């Protein structure tokens, strides 16, 4: 041994076996000074003069208090160096090798990373036993350009996988990546989501302000097609961003700056290896554009400790819309979900497709007794989401009365509210319904005014609104049982079809020499809930440069042409 194992191993193999008699050579060696390995070249299989020059060596003793396992040698060294021989580049990013594949933060954690040997930049102490998306494609590309291999028929069929469409997301906001896959053989599929953006990212510069490189580590394949970024544990703790991560730490962050992120999903069918049948894989790509014009999207209510809700009570939820309702994200509607297991699952829908306006009132569902309740708000058109930051406790109630809607618009003589009634007590419950201080000109008719059945649906019909002027009014319904009395506010917006002429307040009518940004305001009408604003360069309004519907009696027009 002349201190150059690469050249000596190559020579020994060629001299003793003949270079025409092997495709890859690799020496397993003992090293008294710990572990090391060297493939000699990236891409040497079937290359005469280099295909036998790789080695892996180790003292087979642990460098920490952890017991050393031969598996660590097999994965961290042998498989890593063989990966190089088959054309795979490094995937770590604690330093940049400018090949376009440094996509794992710090040391990385897959086979072609340097897990456990780069000090403060270590993601973890040893490699996980799988190849990164980049490594698989490096190897496939290398093999495809070689002819020394023997082709065999693989009876196992390739699965198909979809990463879904690309998305534009708000900054500072968690998101979920979800794949769908099928296997023609019915094999079990394992999913692995990995970020593909290359660039130097070590522990010192890892964080939410990077425009390039990795912001999320690779995680081992799992049966779940969903990857939450950051992981749900961090989201529930409110740790969406992290800087200077430690070994064994999070190594995942959302972005607080504009950037583009490319993700890949690898679907492995884990087919049991046998002669003529080996496991197969499929891949797909997803691109995320993060924009600072929107976000962070976050829940702003139920974030303090010690919150107690009673089943059947009405609670107000608030969230920061943060321009997510505007282009290019365009989330007009969101859904509100509830978890009773501390955020592991969100199996109860509180609201579906409600307006993304930052505030909603929900009725706490019955049949729940939990100290680990969380609220999750998800857009109907995207993959980002927000969760409140503290557990809520829900205590049971003997009965729950909920309405499909708690507000109605009365343009006619009467309105109807539909309700559902449930009993959650072991004792007999009889609940009577009545209104508190109903105006004398109004009358209420209940389909069921005495509720005794455990589960029933009914209606409340209120008439006489033609006797009242246009206004918004609150009617308080009392549901009185043996052990609980609950008051429920129902809002009625009384409207007439008598619309007065709108008077422009600012700017003055026919006033000229306005700036390109104009503040419009006009007299508010009692019977109007919305107004349509149209801007045209034509006196006949035959075409429009702007047309929008708003809820208030003022708006700002920005970026107008000088000729408008």
Model-derived segments and spans:
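Extracellular low-complexity, O-glycosylation-prone stalks/linkers
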Residues: 333-334, 528-545
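Pro/Thr/Ser/Gly-rich low-complexity, intrinsically disordered linker/stalk tracts
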Residues: 497-527, 562
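Long beta-sheet-rich domains in secretory-pathway and surface-associated proteins
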Residues: 159, 190, 206-361, 366-498
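Short S/T/G- and acidic-enriched coil/turn segments that sit immediately N-terminal to beta-strands
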Residues: 249, 358-360, 518, 550-556
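Extracellular (secreted or membrane-anchored) zinc-dependent metallopeptidases
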Residues: 1-266, 273-282
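Solvent-exposed loop segments of extracellular immunoglobulin-like
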Residues: 185-192, 332, 527-531
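A short beta-strand segment in extracellular, disulfide-stabilized domains
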Residues: 173-181, 315-318, 415-420, 517-522
């Amino acid at each position: 041994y002349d201190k150059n194992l690469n050249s000596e191993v190559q020579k020994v193999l060629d001299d003793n076996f003949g270079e025409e008699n092997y495709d890859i050579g690799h020496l397993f060696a003992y090293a008294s000074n710990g572990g090391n390995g060297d493939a000699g070249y990236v891409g040497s299989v079937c290359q005469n003069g280099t295909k036998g020059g790789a080695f892996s060596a180790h003292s087979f003793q642990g460098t920490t208090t952890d017991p050393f396992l031969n598996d660590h040698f097999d994965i961290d060294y042998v498989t890593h160096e063989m990966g190089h021989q088959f054309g795979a580049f490094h995937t770590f990013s604690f330093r940049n090798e400018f090949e376009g594949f440094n996509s794992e933060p710090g040391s990385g954690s897959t086979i072609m990373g340097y897990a456990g040997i780069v000090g403060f930049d270590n993601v973890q102490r040893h490699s996980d036993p799988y190849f990164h998306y980049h490594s698989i494609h490096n190897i496939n590309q290398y093999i495809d350009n070689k002819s020394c291999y023997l082709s065999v028929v693989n009876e196992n069929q390739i699965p198909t996988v979809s990463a879904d469409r690309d998305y534009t997301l708000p900054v500072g906001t968690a998101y979920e990546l979800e794949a769908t896959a099928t296997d023609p053989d019915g094999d079990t599929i394992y999913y692995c989501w990995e970020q593909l953006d290359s660039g130097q990212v070590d522990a010192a510069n890892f964080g939410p302000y990077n425009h390039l490189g990795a912001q999320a580590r690779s995680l081992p394949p799992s049966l779940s097609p969903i990857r939450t970024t950051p992981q749900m544990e961090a989201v529930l703790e409110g740790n969406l961003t992290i800087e200077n991560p430690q070994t064994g730490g999070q190594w995942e962050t959302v972005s607080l700056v504009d950037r583009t992120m490319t993700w890949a999903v690898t679907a492995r069918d884990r087919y049991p290896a046998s002669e003529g049948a080996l496991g197969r894989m499929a891949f797909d790509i997803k691109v995320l554009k993060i924009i600072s014009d929107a976000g962070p999207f976050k829940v702003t209510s139920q974030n303090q400790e010690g919150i107690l809700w009673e089943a059947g009570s009405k609670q107000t939820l608030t969230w920061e819309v943060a321009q997510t309702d505007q282009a290019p994200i365009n989330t007009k509607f969101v859904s509100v979900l509830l978890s009773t297991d501390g955020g592991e699952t969100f199996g109860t829908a509180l609201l579906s497709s409600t307006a993304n306006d930052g505030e909603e009132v929900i009725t706490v569902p019955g049949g729940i007794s939990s100290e680990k309740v969380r609220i999750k708000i998800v857009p109907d058109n995207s993959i980002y989401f927000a969760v409140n930051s503290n557990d809520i406790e829900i205590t049971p109630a003997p009965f729950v009365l909920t309405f499909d809607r708690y507000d109605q618009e009365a343009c006619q003589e009467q309105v109807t509210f539909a309700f559902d009634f449930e009993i959650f007590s072991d004792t007999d419950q009889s609940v009577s319904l009545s209104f508190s201080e109903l105006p004398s000109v109004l009358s209420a008719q209940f389909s069921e005014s005495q509720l005794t059945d455990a589960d029933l649906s009914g209606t409340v019909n209120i008439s006489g609104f033609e006797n009242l002027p246009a206004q918004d009014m609150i009617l308080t319904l009392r549901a009185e049982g043996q052990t609980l009395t609950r008051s429920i506010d129902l809002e009625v917006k009384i409207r007439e079809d008598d619309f007065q002429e709108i008077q422009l307040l600012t700017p003055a009518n026919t006033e000229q020499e306005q700036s390109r940004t104009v503040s419009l305001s006009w007299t508010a009408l009692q019977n109007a809930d919305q107004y349509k604003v149209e801007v045209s360069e034509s006196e006949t309004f035959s075409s429009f440069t702007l047309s929008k519907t708003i809820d208030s009696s003022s708006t700002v027009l920005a970026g107008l042409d000088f000729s408008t």
